[in-house]
């Protein structure tokens, strides 16, 4: 068997994170949300909540929308060429997204994949923007510009929660902002979009 056939696809790590996000959200339906959700007063004594908060969902619609978003993000990462560096950046952004919610102490509880998904979009958008000149960069720039516009329209500085027509829960704009920022910063730190130094690189 040739070396080419043995070579692991670079997107596998991205797919694995997507599966972990979706699988955890499904499994968490059988658990007590109070044991998993983000609560600022428990950040130091129960640090696992900066991971498990992503798996808590407040309604069936909330869960279904985020599972669909996770599937779309997995596909986006594949098209964008998100390899090991991008997956590492997204993984690092996971806990940072929720820890950053301490910046809005009025948000007394949070659960959901949306912050993590915003982080993934920021990473994938940066991957595209830092790629080869041409259409991919245009798509990356448009994706990131749309993300920034969305965050501005949500105005996270106006309060911890926002009621949106069509949703049966209130959204937390700060989670979207913290996720997007964490994803972008982690992408910078991890060198997302830079050429690998060798064939075994990320």
Which ranges hold each PLM region?
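Alpha-helical transmembrane segments that form the membrane-embedded catalytic/substrate-binding core
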Residues: 63-70, 111-122, 168-190
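N-terminal signal-anchor transmembrane helix
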Residues: 1-48, 129, 133-139, 186-202
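Central hydrophobic cores of alpha-helical transmembrane segments
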Residues: 21, 90-95, 138-149
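Terminal transmembrane helical module of multi-pass membrane proteins
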Residues: 141-192
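Internal alpha-helical transmembrane segments of multi-pass membrane proteins
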Residues: 84-85, 112, 132-144
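Mid-bilayer segments of alpha-helical transmembrane spans in multi-pass integral membrane proteins
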Residues: 98-99, 103, 124, 147-152
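Short helix-perturbing small/polar motifs within transmembrane alpha-helices
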Residues: 118-132
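N-terminal TM1-TM2 helical hairpin plus the immediately adjacent luminal interfacial "cap"
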Residues: 15-91, 95-98, 102-110, 165-173
